[in-house]
Amino acid sequence: MASNAAVPFWRAAGMTYITYSNLCANMVRNCLKEPYRAEALSREKVHFSFSKWVDGKPQKPAIRSDTGEE
């Protein structure tokens, strides 16, 4: 069994790597000066579509856009 000394600090803090990397990315974006900050924040948007399945068949897809803000 591995010792606790080898555990990454993000895991020791109770975070997943995705949570840790998102936190770091937000800090870097907030350190940027304008107009670079606005450009970086505009790339943070996410667009995706999803379909609910009923009786083994997909329903009409819904399109969703998230800004990345919680």
Curated annotation (Swiss-Prot):
One of its GO terms (biological process) is proton motive force-driven mitochondrial ATP synthesis. It is found in: Mitochondrion; Mitochondrion inner membrane. It comes from the Eukaryota. The keyword Isomerase does not apply. The keyword Membrane applies. Its main location: mitochondrion. GO terms for cellular component: mitochondrial inner membrane; proton-transporting ATP synthase complex. InterPro entries: ATP_synth_F1_esu_mt (IPR006721), ATP_synth_F1_esu_sf_mt (IPR036742). Keywords: ATP synthesis, CF(1), Hydrogen ion transport, Ion transport, Membrane, Mitochondrion, Mitochondrion inner membrane, Transport. GO terms for molecular function: proton-transporting ATP synthase activity, rotational mechanism. Belongs to the eukaryotic ATPase epsilon family. Mitochondrial membrane ATP synthase (F(1)F(0) ATP synthase or Complex V) produces ATP from ADP in the presence of a proton gradient across the membrane which is generated by electron transport complexes of the respiratory chain. F-type ATPases consist of two structural domains, F(1) - containing the extramembraneous catalytic core, and F(0) - containing the membrane proton channel, linked together by a central stalk and a peripheral stalk. During catalysis, ATP synthesis in the catalytic domain of F(1) is coupled via a rotary mechanism of the central stalk subunits to proton translocation. F-type ATPases have 2 components, CF(1) - the catalytic core - and CF(0) - the membrane proton channel. CF(1) has five subunits: alpha(3), beta(3), gamma(1), delta(1), epsilon(1). CF(0) has three main subunits: a, b and c. This is ATP synthase subunit epsilon, mitochondrial. It comes from Ipomoea batatas.
